């Protein structure tokens, strides 16, 4: 059996557009199903529940397709093998740090703040809230989708299948860019945020030649951004003063840190860097 996932994927009839179709179906069905299931749900809680439920449904659909298609099943042992090189604490730390500095720093200070200064009505669109409900233990169920199912399904489909199929066709960098753009597009209003994250996840996968490190990074980021953890600290803003940069000091500080952190991340994860 070939040891390279792209060789296994290209031996059969599966094409990139097949994967794209599966992803589109999964996300559309997930979104529609979540909206219908939450119609009678408390409107104040609905925004906190909807994304988690939608991504859970989409992830289940993508995983189900994977188990049905023979080419996908055959490549699973290769995609989920042990990392080619050990995952060091330093590498993991820089990867996580640059993800946080992008998601809660440069993306918010460089995109969300200017967008709100132009269009204050986008307050909810960029993921902000004026308050959140008190925490209840049942909300821990909301973590199942973003922390368990989504990292597994999305890394499998976007990095495991699409990235490898496009590497076989176009080469490494066109494949990284194309798979990341599609990953971003499937996150709708957070396209820019997710697209850049997709590049990072792709570099992590290529360094280790295994999906496990990327799944762990993806899951850790999603866990920390839970509304009642770090997410709430950055997502709660006063609508009346949200356009004032003085209310975005933490985001601006993280945005500044993003650049040296991204350089250090690149030094360790750039494609073609010697292993180790």
Language-model features, listed with the residues they occupy:
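Short, Lys/Arg-rich, polar N-terminal cytosolic tail immediately upstream
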Residues: 1-12
């Amino acid at each position: 059996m070939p040891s390279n996932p792209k060789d296994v994927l290209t031996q059969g009839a599966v094409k990139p557009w097949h994967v794209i179709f599966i992803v589109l179906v999964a996300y559309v069905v997930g979104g529609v199903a979540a909206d219908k299931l939450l119609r009678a749900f408390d409107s104040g809680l609905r925004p906190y529940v909807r994304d988690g439920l939608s991504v859970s449904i989409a992830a289940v659909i993508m995983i189900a397709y994977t188990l049905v298609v023979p080419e996908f099943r055959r490549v699973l042992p290769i995609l989920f093998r042990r990392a080619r090189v050990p995952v060091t604490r330093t590498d993991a730390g820089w990867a996580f740090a640059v993800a946080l500095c992008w998601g809660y720093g440069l993306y918010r200070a460089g995109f969300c703040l200017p967008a709100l200064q132009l269009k204050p009505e986008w307050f909810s669109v960029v993921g902000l809230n004026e308050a959140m409900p008190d925490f209840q233990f049942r909300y821990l169920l909301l973590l199942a989708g973003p922390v368990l199912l989504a990292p597994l399904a999305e890394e499998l489909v976007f990095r495991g299948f699409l990235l490898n199929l496009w590497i076989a066709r176009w080469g490494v960098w066109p494949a990284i860019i194309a798979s990341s753009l599609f990953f971003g597009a499937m996150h709708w209003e957070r396209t820019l945020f997710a697209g850049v994250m997709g590049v990072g996840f792709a570099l992590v996968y290529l360094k280790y030649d295994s999906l496990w490190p990327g799944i762990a990074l993806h899951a850790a980021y999603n866990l920390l951004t839970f509304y009642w953890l770090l997410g709430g600290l950055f997502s709660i803003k006063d609508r009346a003063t949200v356009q004032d940069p003085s209310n975005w000091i933490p985001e601006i500080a993280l945005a500044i840190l993003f650049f040296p952190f991204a350089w250090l991340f690149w030094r360790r994860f750039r494609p073609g860097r010697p292993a180790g």
